[in-house]
Amino acid sequence: MKEDMEVLSLASLPVGFRFSPTDEELVRYYLRLKINGHDNDVRVIREIDICKWEPWDLPDFSVVKTTDSEWLFFCPLDRKYPSGSRMNRATVAGYWKATGKDRKIKSGKTKIIGVKRTLVFYTGRAPKGTRTCWIMHEYRATEKDLDGTKSGQNPFVVCKLFKKQDIVNGAAEPEESKSCEVEPAVSSPTVVDEVEMSEVSPVFPKTEETNPCDVAESSLVIPSECRSGYSVPEVTTTGLDDIDWLSFMEFDSPKLFSPLHSQVQSELGSSFNGLQSESSELFKNHNEDYIQTQYGTNDADEYMSKFLDSFLDIPYEPEQIPYEPQNLSSCNKINDESKRGIKIRARRAQAPGCAEQFVMQGDASRRLRLQVNLNSHKSETDSTQLQFIKKEVKDTTTETMTKGCGNFTRSKSRTSFIFKKIAAMGCSYRGLFRVGVVAVVCVMSVCSLVA
């Protein structure tokens, strides 16, 4: 008796039955039969060109109607170029982009029968596409008898489409922030109801050593802004009264600062005694004529000191002279004794009203007297030079008149010598007058020679 086999629909199956083949079953059974042309045996998986449809339209073409977000399709290999190996994965709204690396599919433990590649759908165009929640696994056979080039074979791949549930309502994600892991596994978050906080122990242990200046009791409180719940302890100062502050002020010990004479002598020994004797003899001879050193004597310094003392070591004895306005003109008189040196004259007493003015003027009158004194010496020197110049001019004139024009060059040289002497003279009024007289005489002598 012939038994008829009844085909059951998926809707009539009990709950828990579903079409979910493994990776090895997809390649070893379904893909092999499809490549070899046995379409009726694998009609449970529909053939469709993935790149001609958008991913959100593909679930409606699935043969198996399921509530799971997983669908299987056969897809023919659509090469981008006839002679190339790249696949055309672009659609109207976007493109499929491979991510990660290919994973091997094994039969048993060692035999490799295929590879699995993961692709993610992006809307827009590369490289500014936006990642979506649609994921696809592409299963390809790697055995030589399934390359699709033999007679009766057609190149196919199996595509498993997923829709990730963690991206709600197709929320977009930029391509730059994509992840390499695109497995459709959905992770369930772990909810923590209660978090018990343990008591925080201090990091540094308390030290039992106390400072000698510990504080015991006081009403002094240091103000501070503490934003935490910790309150600042009160600072006490009563214990400060028990401290012997005088012990800290004994800093005059020779061990802290300079050593004592006995300490230095004990450390240095005989060398310290020799140094002390030499230093005493050095200061003992400061009143003698000179001091002998390893570099010579100080004779030159002694001579210079005596020379300066002859001018500066003059006793100053001010005279108390009553203030007389008519005697102010007498301060310009020159003392005859000043010719041998500089003598500081006594300062006359000033009137009470002129005391402030005298302080402001300082020693201006003294400087004037010194200047007059110097001019007086200069005038005497100029008189001697003037007599010599007159004699030279007279001799030159006589010689020029006697010898005539032949000796004009010689007279010219003598005249230049005369002008040099004139330039060496001082610039006093009497000297200028005498120079003018000499110049007139010279001009007259030259004119007579020219005539």
UniProtKB/Swiss-Prot annotation:
<dbReference type="Pfam" id="PF02365">
    <property type="entry name" value="NAM"/>
</dbReference>
<keyword id="KW-0611">Plant defense</keyword>
<feature type="modified residue" description="Phosphothreonine">
    <location>
        <position position="142"/>
    </location>
</feature>
<keyword id="KW-0945">Host-virus interaction</keyword>
<keyword id="KW-0238">DNA-binding</keyword>
<keyword id="KW-0539">Nucleus</keyword>
<feature type="DNA-binding region">
    <location>
        <begin position="113"/>
        <end position="170"/>
    </location>
</feature>
<dbReference type="GO" id="GO:0005634">
    <property type="term" value="C:nucleus"/>
</dbReference>
<dbReference type="GO" id="GO:0051607">
    <property type="term" value="P:defense response to virus"/>
</dbReference>
<keyword id="KW-0804">Transcription</keyword>
<feature type="region of interest" description="Involved in Transcription activation">
    <location>
        <begin position="1"/>
        <end position="268"/>
    </location>
</feature>
<dbReference type="GO" id="GO:0003713">
    <property type="term" value="F:transcription coactivator activity"/>
</dbReference>
<feature type="domain" description="NAC">
    <location>
        <begin position="13"/>
        <end position="164"/>
    </location>
</feature>
<protein>
    <recommendedName>
        <fullName>NAC domain-containing protein 91</fullName>
    </recommendedName>
</protein>
<keyword id="KW-1133">Transmembrane helix</keyword>
<dbReference type="GO" id="GO:0009615">
    <property type="term" value="P:response to virus"/>
</dbReference>
<dbReference type="InterPro" id="IPR036093">
    <property type="entry name" value="NAC_dom_sf"/>
</dbReference>
<dbReference type="GO" id="GO:0016020">
    <property type="term" value="C:membrane"/>
</dbReference>
<dbReference type="GO" id="GO:0000976">
    <property type="term" value="F:transcription cis-regulatory region binding"/>
</dbReference>
<feature type="transmembrane region" description="Helical">
    <location>
        <begin position="431"/>
        <end position="450"/>
    </location>
</feature>
<dbReference type="GO" id="GO:0071456">
    <property type="term" value="P:cellular response to hypoxia"/>
</dbReference>
<dbReference type="GO" id="GO:0016032">
    <property type="term" value="P:viral process"/>
</dbReference>
<dbReference type="GO" id="GO:0002237">
    <property type="term" value="P:response to molecule of bacterial origin"/>
</dbReference>
<dbReference type="GO" id="GO:0003700">
    <property type="term" value="F:DNA-binding transcription factor activity"/>
</dbReference>
<keyword id="KW-0051">Antiviral defense</keyword>
<feature type="region of interest" description="Turnip crinkle virus (TCV) capsid protein- (CP-) binding">
    <location>
        <begin position="351"/>
        <end position="451"/>
    </location>
</feature>
<dbReference type="GO" id="GO:0012505">
    <property type="term" value="C:endomembrane system"/>
</dbReference>
<keyword id="KW-0597">Phosphoprotein</keyword>
<comment type="function">
    <text>(Microbial infection) Compromised function in defense response pathway when interacting with the invading viral capsid protein (CP) of turnip crinkle virus (TCV) due to abnormal subcellular localization.</text>
</comment>
<dbReference type="GO" id="GO:0002230">
    <property type="term" value="P:positive regulation of defense response to virus by host"/>
</dbReference>
<keyword id="KW-0805">Transcription regulation</keyword>
<comment type="subunit">
    <text>(Microbial infection) Interacts via its C-terminal region with the N-terminal region of the turnip crinkle virus (TCV) capsid protein (CP); this interaction prevents its nuclear localization and inhibits its function in basal resistance response pathway.</text>
</comment>
<keyword id="KW-0812">Transmembrane</keyword>
<dbReference type="GO" id="GO:0003677">
    <property type="term" value="F:DNA binding"/>
</dbReference>
<comment type="function">
    <text>Transcription activator essential for the anti-viral defense called virus basal resistance response pathway. Not involved in HRT-mediated hypersensitive response (HR) and resistance to TCV. Binds DNA non specifically. Activated by proteolytic cleavage through regulated intramembrane proteolysis (RIP).</text>
</comment>
<keyword id="KW-0472">Membrane</keyword>
<dbReference type="InterPro" id="IPR003441">
    <property type="entry name" value="NAC-dom"/>
</dbReference>
<keyword id="KW-0010">Activator</keyword>
